Design a protein with these regions (language model features):
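Glycine-rich phosphate-binding loop used to anchor ATP phosphates in small-molecule kinases
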Residues: 97-178
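Hydrophobic anchor at the beta1->P-loop junction of P-loop NTPases
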Residues: 38
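Extreme N-terminal, non-catalytic leader segments
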Residues: 1-34, 68, 74-76
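Post-Walker A alpha-helix
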Residues: 49-50, 54
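P-loop (Walker A) phosphate-binding loop of NTP-binding proteins
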Residues: 41
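Conserved substrate/cofactor phosphate-moiety recognition/catalytic segment
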Residues: 55-105, 148
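Conserved lysine of the Walker
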Residues: 46
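A glycine- and Lys/Arg-enriched "phosphate-lid" helix/loop adjacent to the NTP-binding pocket
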Residues: 143-220
Length: 231
């Protein structure tokens, strides 16, 4: 069972080959490799925390959140996807018309994250003994925090939520992603809202504090409730 640990609020500011099932998609099969997911609210300081970790040791490798895919921006080393060729900033579309785009965004966010987290590790990482790979969020928070919050707030219908849960469970059973631990960057909703305004990401300028409060409650329930189990 993966370990969970919470980090208190600090001063943080703001063509690769896919591994085939035959190679066991769970890359923790690499000897000595540890896989840790860093979780937290929007603007909790995850990117800064991960950058500091990466700079602190050559044994640390970071898989960042694929947000550029959601913004329709071609990031270095990635090919342009069919959705990008069609145009559209899906992150912005979700924030502007959440009920219309909730299912589309939550589906694509999870699938793009899954793709990023299943890429074959660089040789220098895979060959290094006792290395650790840190992930900016996981497919578990995609479901248990963001998608579930959309359902609870009425942005996802019962039918959409049931379909989401069905394919999400199937993918995790078919493409196992084991995590050895979860690090939770616990930050107050007010602080994350202030940081979000400060960093000035255009899509986030109208995000309400109440939305961050709801996400905070979901993180607390998932990561700090000892009775809760990942499904």
């Amino acid at each position: 069972m993966a370990k969970r640990c919470a980090a208190g609020e600090g001063e943080l500011q703001g063509n690769e080959e896919m591994i085939s099932p035959a190679k066991k998609l769970c890359t923790s099969a690499v000897s000595g490799l540890r896989r840790i997911a860093v979780e937290g609210n929007i603007a909790a300081g995850k990117s800064t925390f991960l950058r500091l970790l990466k700079e602190s040791s050559p044994a640390y490798h970071v898989i960042s959140e694929p947000i550029t895919k959601w913004q329709n921006v071609d990031s270095p080393g990635d090919s342009v996807t069919a959705s990008q060729q069609c145009g559209g900033n899906l992150l912005d579309m979700f924030y502007r018309e959440p009920k219309r785009w909730a299912y589309t965004f939550q589906t694509y966010a999870c699938l793009s994250r899954l793709k990023a987290q299943l890429r074959q590790l660089p040789q220098e990482v895979a060959s290094q003994p006792n290395s650790t790979i840190f992930f900016e969020r996981s497919v578990h928070s995609d479901k248990l925090v963001f998608a579930e919050n959309c359902h609870d707030s009425g942005l996802l219908s019962d039918v959409e939520w049931n379909i989401y849960c069905d394919w999400h469970s199937f993918l995790l059973e078919s493409l196992p992603l084991h995590f050895d631990a979860f690090i939770y960057l616990k930050t107050t909703p007010q602080t994350t809202w202030e940081r979000m305004q400060k960093r000035g990401r255009p899509e986030e300028q109208d995000v309400a504090l109440d939305y961050l409060k709801s996400l905070h409650e979901k993180h607390e329930k998932w990561l700090l409730d000892s009775e809760n189990k990942m499904k």
